[in-house]
Amino acid sequence: MIDYTAVEAYGNPILVDDHDNRVSAFREIVQLTKKPHNALAIVQLSHPGRQGSKALNPHPISASDVHLKLKWAGNEFAPPRAMSLDDIRHNIKQWGQSAYLAWQAGFDGVQIHCAHGYLLAQFLSPSTNLRTDSYGGTPTNRARLIFEIIAEIDRRVRTHDPTFLLCVKLNSVEFQDRGTTPQEARDLCIALEAARVDFVDLSGGTFEGRAFHHVKDSTRAREAYFIEFAEMIRPLLQKTKVFVTGGFRSASGMALAVEQGACDGVGIGRPLAAEPYLCRDILAGRVSGAIENLVPLPMNTQASGTQLHQVAKGEELVSDWSASAEVERWIEENERETKRKIQVLPRVDSSGFPWLRAERGFAYLK
């Protein structure tokens, strides 16, 4: 997160300044990430806008004062305030500062999160951007903030280090009646290439319209939720690379997406929470894909958080969500944790994910 006062959920890491030597702590993460294969370390920067838990973000800001009226994993969302021009100028500097600190920590680049209904997606979408000034109205105006952030990151970092990578995570389609269209998103990708964005990571959907439920059968067959959009824009981009994140589970599906030219690379999220060495094992030919996850949507995001806690605590096992008994145990614990969090509000005393000691799982450390 780029702002102490704007977090999306419990446990969000924040990179705003060097308080408590956090740049050194992030540098440690970078060093571990790069070993032993000298992998690239790119950190995602984000601002939730209106889409942050009411308990943690009681006075949110957004492109406009459009309230997100739903509950998500036990969270409610406060009505947002439309950002003033001063707010926007300050926000631009925050993105630049966080990118600069990431560079100081040794990251090879940053990803600007413009997807999943968070702040920059709120500016892009006519559903949430009702502004009548230079940041609203036309697709160009709604995207203006993103390009001003890119210019600030160029000023703070890339003028000093041209090798610093810049990525934009983008909604391919918002799956809302008045959301951004694939054509608008395609035009945006072309403009991002002109702004020297190194790669775009295509995803989609918001809390209001979970994209993972609204995909074509042909897309489901190839696993990636947003691959059809990638196929449309990749031939139009000369230098900017296209990645697709969302839905990949089998090695064959990942390979096919790249071999057929739909994208240059694939992103994997939740499967890595269960199997930290999944990528290594796929490349070595030891496994053919990720294990099945029986935790129902949308709770499986929370379930992945539990797995990350198990890894962070050095537990011997990571829960196996392909085992129905383990899933049932987790669902019961999740209900208890949700009730407990509500009772202690506004105090925040945990990361928000239910804690569970695995009974059926993977000995990932062996």
Indicate residue ranges for each PLM-predicted region:
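Flavin-dependent oxidoreductase catalytic cores
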Residues: M1-K366
